[in-house]
């Protein structure tokens, strides 16, 4: 399986390439990508530099233009598609039908991948995107069970890519507008669950508080690790009980599922984390490269594949809340 790794900056891109990525994915420094954070992402000059670095080492490069344009901003998304095509990226990762349609019509030689933000959860949707836009691959949402992924793989007309490690989203990607209730912006339109301008951190007598547009999201005791302040992972007072009402901070880790994902025909596994540091990217990619190489070496006897304890420990140390989960892949309900 192909190892697809995050590149939120040029140093992170180098870290991914140097530690074994088969492919890296990046976004431009604007609202056209779903990791639009201050100080991250690429302008044209940095993108050219990153693409040259990756390609000189045999690594493919994908460009994520995976938010949903608003009427007044269509030209920004148009220009992003044109730039990606001009840079000759290996594929464009898109979600919006208008963006995919424009790319397919104006740049027919540009390979298209359906973003996880496209929320394709059944093979009829995959057929539609294949017929209308000739997509080559689809990234599946993180809300599907392994049985559902296997069913899709049997019928899909395109390659499938799944998330393997990183921040876990409990929503069906591309359909979450939760943060817009507080900030008037959402990851689907502006590229960030919690826009930096709305985030505030404050040391108080009760602990470190995180606020989103002045609404208290969480409070951390001394020595407690603070997480990224999103509404879905905040602690709330529910009938007198304060707890993570929607989701506890944790990270997806599917090392144990590598043989199963391989056997059902998954083409690529994706590491989430374009907002993460180069050191984070380097360590995660290194572990996943070792695991995939071991699985490949044992392809004739996949039952012998065993995850090394130090791999899991290394990933746990880098995870949100210092815990990991296999998420929806092994849920008992469908």
Each language-model region and where it sits:
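Active-site pocket-lining/capping segments in soluble small-molecule metabolic enzymes
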Residues: 1-120, 139, 147-268, 274-334
């Amino acid at each position: 399986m192909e190892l697809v790794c995050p590149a939120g900056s040029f140093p992170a891109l180098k870290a991914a390439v140097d530690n074994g990525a088969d492919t890296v994915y990046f976004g431009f420094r604007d609202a056209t990508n779903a990791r639009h954070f201050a100080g991250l992402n690429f302008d044209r000059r940095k993108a050219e530099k990153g693409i040259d670095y990756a390609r000189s080492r045999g690594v493919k490069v994908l460009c994520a233009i995976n938010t949903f344009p608003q009427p007044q901003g269509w030209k920004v998304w148009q220009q992003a598609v044109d730039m990606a095509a001009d840079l000759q990226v290996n594929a464009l990762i898109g979600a919006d039908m208008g963006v995919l349609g424009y790319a397919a019509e104006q740049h027919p030689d540009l390979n298209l991948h359906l973003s996880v933000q496209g929320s394709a959860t059944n093979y009829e949707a995959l057929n539609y995107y294949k017929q209308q836009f000739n997509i080559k691959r689809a990234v599946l949402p993180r809300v599907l069970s392994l049985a559902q992924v296997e069913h899709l793989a049997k019928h899909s007309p395109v390659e499938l890519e799944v998330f393997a490690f990183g921040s876990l989203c409990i929503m069906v990607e591309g359909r979450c507008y939760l943060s817009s209730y507080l900030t008037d912006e959402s990851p689907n339109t502006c590229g960030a669950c919690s826009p930096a301008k709305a985030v505030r951190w404050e040391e108080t007598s009760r602990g470190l508080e995180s606020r989103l547009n002045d609404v208290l999201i969480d409070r951390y005791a001394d020595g407690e690790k603070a997480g990224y302040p999103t509404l879905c992972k905040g602690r709330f007072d529910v009938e007198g009980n304060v707890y993570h009402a929607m989701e506890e901070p944790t990270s997806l880790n599917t090392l144990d599922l590598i043989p199963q994902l391989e056997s059902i025909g998954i083409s690529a596994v994706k590491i989430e984390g374009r907002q993460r540091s180069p050191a984070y990217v380097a360590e995660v990619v290194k572990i996943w490269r070792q695991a995939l190489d071991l699985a490949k070496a044992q392809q004739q006897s996949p039952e012998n594949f065993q995850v090394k304890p130090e791999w899991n420990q290394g990933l746990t140390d880098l995870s949100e809340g210092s815990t990991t989960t296999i998420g929806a892949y092994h849920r008992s309900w469908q």
